[in-house]
Amino acid sequence: MNIPRVQASIKAPTRASSSWTVTARRVAYHRGTLSQLGRFTTVPARLYQNMASASRSSSFKLQEKLIPNMGSRGKSMDSLKEHLTYDKLDRLRNFWFEHLPQDTDRIIAGSEYQKRWFVSDKQFDDICVAEFSPILEAIRNTGVTSGKHLLSIVKPRSSLDWLSLIILLDQIPRNSYRGDKASVCFTYFDPLAVQISLEAIAQGIPDNAPEIRWVFSHRNWFYMPLMHSEDLSVHDEAVSAFNRMNEDILSLTEGTGGTDEYERKAREVVQADPNKAKNVGQTSVEFEERHRVIIERFGRYPHRNKVLGRKMRSEENDFLSSGGDTFGS
């Protein structure tokens, strides 16, 4: 299977006003003029051939089929297949990273660029809802609860399709279902995202696919679902994963060259501003540790209790009252 290489520049979006008219224009813009795949959103042909090939000489092989095709399950399944297409996965990935002015900013995305992802913005939410929440609703309507089942429907073509799918399940719900609606993130989409994240890690995608491993703003999203889990064993995996990413960043602060174009470029970017790169890696590790300690202590995130209808324990109430982490919730 060949992946088309379409070259296009990545435009940084302008911030819209709060009016619905402007929001509508922005949604229309994203529908009509989203940039196509740039050099870091398309797998080089030779690399993809190595991934998909069954040759034993390949150092990394992407498993295209996890379980047999289960076929259509009525209108809901047909609707899902209509919504969850390769084109939509490409559009989501382009939208998610379009604010980065240079491809090199994907390797190390500074805090000024990460705000788009982690600071609540109604205009950003509106686009997520208009463009991508129909896919989420189509998934919900099928009642799919297995990550492997969903993967058998999607059939990711490359590691970048996996990236888009994880962002779709782990991040878009957080932009689409806020406030009292947030429970669906925690009870439905998060478990799917965790399963697919763990499957990706088991296949070695974030650790071995160069366009993920050495492009750290890509790699980070593979591990985010683990951070959101309330399962301590999943956090153990998250700690290991973020530490591996940090070690890779540190390995680039010295030496020259690399085994592929992605590693070579990543080394150039890191060595151009090593403190910035180190901060990105260390911050990810520390942020996961802040999440894990809460799960280790309470077995769950206290700040989710209200929206999930869980009774607040006294020690949890004390924790929140004293300024315990809620991570923006």
Predicted feature residues:
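N-terminal mitochondrial targeting presequence
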Residues: 1-68, 75
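Intrinsically disordered, low-complexity activation-like regions
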Residues: 52-329
